[in-house]
Swiss-Prot record:
Role played: Catalyzes the thiamine diphosphate-dependent decarboxylation of 2-oxoglutarate and the subsequent addition of the resulting succinic semialdehyde-thiamine pyrophosphate anion to isochorismate to yield 2-succinyl-5-enolpyruvyl-6-hydroxy-3-cyclohexene-1-carboxylate (SEPHCHC).
Species lineage: Bacteria, Bacillati, Cyanobacteriota, Cyanophyceae, Synechococcales
EC number(s) on file: 2.2.1.9
InterPro entries named among the record's database cross-references: MenaQ_synth_MenD, THDP-binding, Thiamin_PyroP_enz_TPP-bd_dom, TPP_enzyme_TPP-bd
MF-aspect GO terms: 2-succinyl-5-enolpyruvyl-6-hydroxy-3-cyclohexene-1-carboxylic-acid synthase activity; magnesium ion binding; manganese ion binding; thiamine pyrophosphate binding
Reactions catalysed according to its record: isochorismate + 2-oxoglutarate + H(+) = 5-enolpyruvoyl-6-hydroxy-2-succinyl-cyclohex-3-ene-1-carboxylate + CO2
Pathway: Quinol/quinone metabolism; 1,4-dihydroxy-2-naphthoate biosynthesis; 1,4-dihydroxy-2-naphthoate from chorismate: step 2/7; Cofactor biosynthesis; phylloquinone biosynthesis
Broad EC category: transferase
Source organism per UniProt: Prochlorococcus marinus (strain MIT 9303)
Swiss-Prot/TrEMBL keywords: Magnesium, Manganese, Metal-binding, Thiamine pyrophosphate, Transferase
Protein name: 2-succinyl-5-enolpyruvyl-6-hydroxy-3-cyclohexene-1-carboxylate synthase
Amino acid sequence: MGLRHLVLCPGSRSGPLALAAGGMARTNLLRLSTAIDERSAAFLALGFSTATGTAAAVVTTSGTAVANLLPAAVEADRSCQPLLLLTADRPYRLKDCGANQTVNQETFLSPACRWIGQGPREGLHLFSTETLESFAEEAWQRAHHPAGAVHLNLPFEEPLHLSEEEQRVIWKGWSPKIPRSAPITPTNLAMAAEGTEGVTDRAPFALDPFRPGVVIAGAWRGLSKDLFAFQQSLREWQALSGWPVLADPLSALPSDQPGLIRSWELLLAAGLLGSHEQLQVLRLGPMSASRSLEAWLKSFGDGQLLITEGDSRCLDPLGLSVQWSHGLTTWWQHHHHRWIDADAASQQATQPLLKKWQIIDRFAQDWLDQQLPLQGAITEPALARWLSRLLPAELSIMLAASSPVRDWLAYADKSLFSRRCFSFRGASGIDGTLSLSMGLAMALGPTLLVSGDLALLHDSNGWLLAHPQRPPLVVVLIDNGGGGIFEQLLVKKAPSEAFEQLFAMPQAVDPLVLAAAHNIPHRQVACLEDLPAALEWGLFQTGPVLIRVCTHRGQDSSMRQQLREGLVMHLQSISQNGHIDL
C-alpha cells in the first residue's frame, strides 16, 4: 500500500496487530516505533505523515486508549494530513454488558475522520484474505483523498497471542500484496469526507493579471508530491502579473520566490500598506495567524479568489471569496493560455505597487536588523529574527502555536523561506507539540522545535519517544513563566494576580530537571551572544537536546509594541526625506 511508519502502543487486545507489526519490522517492511502514551503516539505518527506526505499508522488497544487519539485526529483533519488509526476492540457480544475495557469506541473519532472502517462485529478473523486486502486498500486511499485521518476499528476474538511457531507458519506463507494498477481515485471516493459541510467549490474565474493585485499565501496543505508544481505555477503567475506576494512562513514558498514582501505583517499592523479597494486578491490556502491581515482583507470586500489544494470545505472565515478547491496548478493550467502572448508592457499598471512595497520592505528589514542585533539579553522577537539565520539551510523548523508562530511571522527574515517550516495551524492547539516534532525529526533528520514552556510541558511525555531511536531534534524552549500569548491578545485587563491565575498559569516545574529525568542533554543560554555556540552544540549531539532560554513576557509584549511604533516613525521619517512614498 505504501505504509512505511507505524507507532505501536501497549495492550493485550491489540496483540495480533502488535505481532504483525513486529514481523513486518523484522523484515524491513516498515519502521516500527513504540510509545506508552496513545495521545503522544498519535502525534508522533502525525509527524511522520506531515514530513512525508503519506500516512503513518498508530495501533492501540481498546477502551480509553482510543479516546486519546482524538486530538491528533482533529489536527490531521484540519491540517489535511493523512493518518491511519488502528484500534483493537472487543467482539460485539461483549458490548453494553459490563465487560471489562469495553466501550463504544467505534464512535469516538468519527467527527474528525475521513472514514470509519469497522471490522466484523464478531472478530477480524471472519474477513477473507481478499476482503481484508480490499479493506486495507480502501482505508489507505481514503486517508489520502482528501488527506485526513481514517479510523479502522478492529474487533478481535480470543485467542489473541500466537505461539512463535504459529507466527512462523503465518509469515512463511504471507507476502505483501502489490497494489492494483487502477487505484481508487478521489472521484469515486466522493472527493470529500463523509459529513463534510460548507463546500464552496464553484467554477473558477480568471483574475486580470494586468491590473494591480496581491497574492496572499497561507499554510501549505497539499500533498508533498504536488508542492513543486504549486511553486512553479505561482512563479509563472507572479512573472505574468508582477503582483507582490505576502507569504506565511508555513507556505512552503522558497526564499527566491519573486515578489516576496517579508515585512508585511509589521507593515499591515502599523497601517503602512494602506487600503486598496481596487486591488485584486488571490488567496492560497487557509488564513494566516495575522489579525492585521484579516482586517486588511475585509477592506477589499468580496470577489476575492481563494484556491485550496484539494480541501473542498469552506476555508474563508471572512466570507468574501470564491473558492476553487482543486489547487493552484489546476487553476493555472485552466487559465494561462489566455495570456500566453502577453509582453512586458502589459505589466505597466502592476509594477509600481510591487516596486513601492519592495522599497518599503527593504527599509523595514534594515531597521529590524538595527533594532534586533545578536547581542544582549534574549528576547522573543530577537530569537525569531536570528534562529533561522544561524541554522543550516536544509534544517526544518517546527514552531509551537501561540507566540512562536506569530513572532516568526513578524520578525523572521527571508532566510526562513530557505527551509520547510511546520506548525499547528489546523486546529491551532499546543497539544502534541513535542511528539509531532519527534516524528518530523525521525523522518526528515535534524529538526528544530521552538516552543513555549506551557506547550512543551503539556506534551512532556514526548520526551519518552527519545529512546531508543534518538531522533535528531533540537528543542529551543522559550521559558517566560506561563502563557505569553495572552499578553498579546489584550486580555490583561484583569488585575495582575487574576491574570496570572486565569490566563498565564505559570507552572512550578524546572524544565532542565525534567529533561535530566528523561536523560536528555540540556543547557541554558543567558544571552544572545551565546546562542550560536549552543545551537552548534545541539546539532552535534546524536539525539534530542533541550536549550532553555528565559525571557520576560511582559517586557517582550511591550517590546513588540515599541517595534511597531518605532517602525512607523522610522518609515515616516524616510518618507519625509523623499526616499519612499507612503
